[in-house]
């Protein structure tokens, strides 16, 4: 299992956002979390990404990639996430090409000294996702759907072990929804 939670409770701003979570996710599984607003789906993503930490009690356990404590850099290399938190961290003056390139380096800003190999990877994924026409557009000028598909390309470029998408097809046109699914 790459993710194991036993009796996990999490609090955010003084409110319990996850109560007694018990969940195991195998490497080979595709998981879809469905639930009403406020049920803890996005909070679980924050736990996985180590943006919020659970309250560990006697019977509680949390392991990610088989480790109770994991180096954040290792985590960032192995997991790619697309959610509103990521969208809000992106420099709005970044062009889409540079946005996708930043995914290779785990950054949210312009990357200097990019290699030809890395540029080729960006061009390849943009072509595959049919967004080459967005290459020189600034992130702030994109539609919500264009932002989403560009962020998915950014997440995929480093070929992560785990891809986490929060509301992955929201704001996407039919063709893009089909590609993501």
Locate each region found by the language model:
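Conserved ABC ATPase signature
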Residues: 114, 138-142, 146
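The feature captures the beta-strand-to-loop junction immediately N-terminal to the Walker
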Residues: 34-36
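Conserved structural motif at the start of ABC-family nucleotide-binding domains
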Residues: 3, 18-20
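Helix-to-loop junction immediately C-terminal to a conserved catalytic motif
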Residues: 49
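Catalytic Walker B motif of ABC-type/P-loop ATPase nucleotide-binding domains
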Residues: 163-167
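Hydrophobic anchor residue at the start of the ABC signature
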Residues: 152, 180
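Conserved ABC ATPase "signature" region
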Residues: 116-134, 159
């Amino acid at each position: 299992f790459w993710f194991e939670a036993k009796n996990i409770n999490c609090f955010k701003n003084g409110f319990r956002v996850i109560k007694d979570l018990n969940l195991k996710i195998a490497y080979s599984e595709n998981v879809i979390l469905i639930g009403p607003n406020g049920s803890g789906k996005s909070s679980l993503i924050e736990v996985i990404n180590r943006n919020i930490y659970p309250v560990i009690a006697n019977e509680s356990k949390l392991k990610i990639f088989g480790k109770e404590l994991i180096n954040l850099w290792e985590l960032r290399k192995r997991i790619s996430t697309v959610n509103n938190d990521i969208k809000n961290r992106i420099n709005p003056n970044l062009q889409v090409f540079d946005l996708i390139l930043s995914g290779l380096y785990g950054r949210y800003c312009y990357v200097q000294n990019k290699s030809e190999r890395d540029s080729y990877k960006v061009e390849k994924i943009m072509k595959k996702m049919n967004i080459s026409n967005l290459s020189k557009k600034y992130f702030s000028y994109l539609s919500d759907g264009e932002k989403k598909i560009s962020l998915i390309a950014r997440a995929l470029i480093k070929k992560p072990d785990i891809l986490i998408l929060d509301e992955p097809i929201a704001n996407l046109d039919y063709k893009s929804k089909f590609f993501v699914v």
